[in-house]
Amino acid sequence: EMIEYIDIGGITLIRAAAKNHRHVTLLTDPAQYPAVIDELKRDGATTGATRTRLAADAFALTATYDAAISRFMRTQAPSEGLPERLPIGLIKVTDVRYGENPHQRGALYRTIGDSPLVSMTVLQGKELSFNNYLDVMGAFALVRDLGAGSIAIIKHNNPCGAAWQGDVL
């Protein structure tokens, strides 16, 4: 049963260390190691700002973990109504060239699990923007609905063209 795989101890230790971040440097991701090692070598200790940032990262990690558990549990006892609370744990995949407008920052996030859109490879052109990702998601959804042998053309998240041929040969 899946419930046996829910971690209690590790998450509790992470939360306790994050709560005590004024006195504890908590690393929850190997990607954090180089910056902390550099700071320790340079200053002999981590700064309060670093510890606070790492604590925020830790609480984001535990919230994402809890959101995944909540999502799983909801599938085990579906209800007809909409939930009062719906936690969504998102994991950053990449920064995008810009947000919805060129003066805005943006990033692509995914939920826990696989998504074909996040594993795609850009074959040609610039780094994608937020709007480019919306176009890709719109095209993917339309082609998925039309089925094999279909194509979609999307501009600013609006379908400009779509075609389907049952036999592509």
Please give the residue ranges for each predicted region.
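Active-site cavity-forming subdomains of large catalytic enzyme subunits
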Residues: 1-28
